[in-house]
């Protein structure tokens, strides 16, 4: 009679064992990482499998570890576009300018290879994975919903940097400062060296000229698309100035027998070329008066500026103004700019390390203001009443109070500062530091597809007249000119 009880107990024990086994098997299945859902960061699925699972990991580029990993957080598509301490890592449509691609790539036939290879101290990505990332970037690096970063707001505040070593214009977000797009400029395979960039007075367009080119090019600021170009013949087109109504431009050819090209910016047609061989010598900087009737052009290799009456811009008259009657070193006037009210104009004199100030009505010298070594470009803040002057050899920006006509501070900004631009909305000044091999400046973080040595951006806080602490953003090769679109 005991046998049935024993069998019943065995049956019960067996059922319990099966239940435990099923529970254990179920737990193992739940622990399988291949089955676990994960936060894809709103990357496309195939991209998320690579970036989220292999890059945005503990000890590397996730939110918790980013400070020890160059400040780069790859946890989400949005945080990726904040970049790292050196700037943007992903530039939509440009894997050839994206360090995210450089540092995962191990095959030079696919593009740039940089060290150390990422993921750090782990097996490198397969070629298929590298191609997935490269092709995704070249398609605009869209998110999980197909959206392209920075394409949502045609009125976005931005600033532009012309990188003359690569024929690239960097389009920077005014909030994060990162490069949103790289625009190839020029119309020839050879490097044409974009030397100056300017946003139109109404903020609708930007223009660029070249020291080894034959055009001025026009682009829309809403989407940075090419609009048109005006043929102005081959020359060393260094600088240009735009009338206050945005309809006309004068472009200067820096050559021994220099020229000025007068262009209608609405039709993008060359209307006239001003020249006087043997007399109009090495012109460089230029500025048009607020009323649009007087054009000033500096003659960089001497003591002269040229004053043109362009009331009739097709048949102008000009005169020569001597700006240094004190003897000694030549003034070598580089650039010229009007005060906000138009009553004065300022001339950087690189040969004498000073800014000279003149009365617009009489062209009489008002003041000679000492600067740091080799003053070049200028940008004015009407709100602060400051004139900011890059001094390339002095590695500084000299700040001049335009109400008292005195220098108030020299700010060390970086190696070989050249272009700069005031951003009134942000109370900042953007400074492009060329950082060429002869400068003694810091080695760049990386080398891009065009080779050469990258420059970098620093920022002055206009409230404190100090650099923004810890900010140094890598640019492309030989950044030369900056312009703001507010």
Language-model segments: which ranges?
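Hydrophobic alpha-helical segments, principally membrane-spanning helices and signal/leader peptides
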Residues: 11-12, 29, 111, 283, ...
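Aromatic- and Gly/Pro-enriched helix-to-coil junctions and flexible linker segments
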Residues: 28-157
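A detector of low-complexity, intrinsically disordered, Ser/Thr/Gly/Pro/Ala-rich segments
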Residues: 1-4, 8, 88, 219, ...
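Bacterial Sec-dependent N-terminal signal peptides
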Residues: 1-43, 66
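N-terminal non-cleavable signal-anchor helices
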Residues: 19-21, 26, 131, 311, ...
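Generic N-terminal helix/loop capping motif
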Residues: 23, 80, 103, 107, ...
């Amino acid at each position: 009679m005991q046998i049935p009880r024993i069998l019943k107990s065995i049956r019960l024990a067996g059922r319990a064992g099966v239940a435990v086994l099923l529970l254990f098997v179920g737990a193992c299945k739940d622990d399988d990482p291949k089955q676990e859902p994960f936060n894809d960061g709103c990357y496309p699925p195939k991209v998320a499998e690579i970036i989220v699972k292999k890059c945005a990991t503990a000890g590397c580029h996730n939110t918790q570890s980013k400070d020890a990993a160059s400040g780069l957080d790859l946890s989400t598509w949005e945080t990726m576009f904040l970049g790292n301490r050196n700037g943007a890592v992903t530039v939509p449509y440009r894997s050839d300018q994206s360090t995210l691609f450089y540092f995962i790539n191990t095959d030079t036939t696919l593009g740039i290879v940089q060290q150390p290879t990422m993921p750090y101290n782990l097996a490198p990505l397969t070629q298929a994975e590298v191609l997935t990332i490269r092709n995704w970037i070249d398609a605009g690096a869209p998110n999980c919903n197909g959206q392209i970063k920075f394409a949502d707001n045609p009125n976005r505040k931005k600033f532009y940097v012309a990188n003359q070593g690569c024929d690239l214009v960097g389009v920077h977000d005014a909030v994060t400062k990162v490069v949103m797009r790289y625009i190839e400029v020029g119309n020839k395979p050879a490097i044409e060296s974009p030397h100056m960039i300017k946003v139109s007075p109404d903020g609708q367009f930007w223009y660029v000229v070249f020291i080894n080119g034959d055009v001025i090019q026009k682009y829309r600021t809403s989407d940075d698309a090419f609009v048109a170009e005006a043929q102005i013949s081959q020359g060393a087109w260094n600088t240009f100035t735009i009338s206050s109504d945005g309809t006309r431009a004068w472009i200067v050819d820096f050559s021994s027998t220099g020229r000025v090209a007068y262009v209608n910016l609405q039709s993008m047609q060359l209307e006239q070329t001003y020249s006087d061989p043997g007399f109009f010598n090495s012109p460089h900087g230029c500025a048009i008066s607020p009323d649009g009737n007087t054009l000033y052009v500096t003659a960089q290799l001497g003591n002269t500026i040229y004053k043109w009456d362009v009331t009739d811009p097709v048949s102008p008259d000009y005169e020569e103004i001597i700006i240094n009657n004190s003897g000694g070193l030549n003034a070598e006037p580089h650039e010229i700019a009007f005060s906000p009210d138009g009553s004065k104009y300022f001339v950087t004199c690189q040969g004498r390390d000073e800014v000279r100030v003149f009365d617009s009505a009489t062209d009489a010298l008002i003041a000679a203001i000492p600067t740091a070594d080799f003053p070049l470009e200028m940008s004015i803040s009407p709100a602060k009443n400051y004139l900011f002057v890059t001094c390339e050899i002095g590695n500084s920006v000299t700040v001049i109070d335009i109400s008292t006509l005195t220098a108030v501070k020299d700010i060390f900004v970086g190696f070989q500062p050249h272009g700069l631009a005031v951003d009134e909305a942000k109370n900042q000044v953007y400074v492009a530091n060329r950082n060429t091999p002869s400068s003694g400046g810091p080695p760049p973080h990386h080398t891009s597809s065009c080779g050469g040595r990258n420059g970098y951006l620093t920022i002055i806080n206009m409230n404190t007249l100090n650099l923004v602490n810890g900010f140094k953003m890598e640019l492309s090769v030989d950044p030369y000119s900056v312009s703001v679109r507010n």
